[in-house]
C-alpha cells in the first residue's frame, strides 16, 4: 500500500503542475486541461484513500507517533484542497500565484513529514521504525 501511495502522490504532483500550466491567462483552459484535471482528481482521490489506509494500519499496529501521523494526514488533505483552489482561481482568471506557491510549500512540508515517519526512509535507514 505504501508504494501505491507514493506513486499516486508523485503522479498527482506532476499532474497538478501540468494542469496548472495548461490554463492560459487570456483564453482559459487548453484542450488538454479537462482530461488532465480529471486524471489529477483521480490520483488525488487515490492518494487520500491509500494515505488513510496507511494511517489506519499505523494506528492498529501501535508504537507509531500518532501526533505526526495525524499532522501529516491534515497536511495531505490541505494539499488536495489547495490544489483544487489554485486551479479554480487560475481558471477564473484571478490572482493564483500565491496560492500555487503556498501549495508547493505545503507539499514539501507534507513530504518531509512522510520521510521522518516510521514508514519513511529515514526511519528505515536508522532502524527507528
From Swiss-Prot:
Signal sequence, renumbered to the chain: none
Cystine bridges: none
Keywords: Cell membrane, Membrane, Transmembrane, Transmembrane helix
Pfam families, per database record: DUF1516
InterPro entries: UPF0344 (IPR010899)
Location in or out of the cell: Cell membrane
Keyword Isomerase appears in the UniProt entry: no
Membrane topology: Multi-pass membrane protein
Entry's transmembrane regions: 1-21, 36-56, 67-87, 99-119
Any one cellular-component term (Gene Ontology): plasma membrane
Keyword Cell membrane among record annotations: yes
Family listed: Belongs to the UPF0344 family.
Protein's recorded name: UPF0344 protein SAR0931
Taxonomy of the source species: Bacteria, Bacillati, Bacillota, Bacilli, Bacillales
Amino acid at each position: 500500500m505504501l508504494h501505491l501511495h507514493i506513486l499516486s502522490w508523485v503522479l498527482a504532483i506532476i499532474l497538478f503542475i501540468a494542469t496548472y500550466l495548461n490554463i492560459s491567462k487570456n483564453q482559459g483552459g487548453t484542450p488538454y486541461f479537462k482530461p488532465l484535471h480529471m486524471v489529477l482528481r483521480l490520483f488525488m482521490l487515490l492518494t487520500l484513500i491509500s494515505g488513510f489506509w496507511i494511517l489506519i494500519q499505523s494506528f492498529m499496529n501501535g508504537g507509531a507517533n500518532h501526533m505526526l501521523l495525524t499532522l501529516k494526514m491534515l497536511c495531505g488533505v490541505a494539499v488536495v484542497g489547495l490544489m483544487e483552489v489554485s486551479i479554480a482561481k487560475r481558471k477564473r482568471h484571478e490572482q493564483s500565484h500565491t496560492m500555487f506557491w503556498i501549495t508547493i510549500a505545503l507539499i514539501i512540508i507534507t513530504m518531509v513529514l512522510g520521510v521522518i515517519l516510521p514508514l519513511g526512509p529515514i526511519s528505515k535507514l536508522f532502524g527507528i521504525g
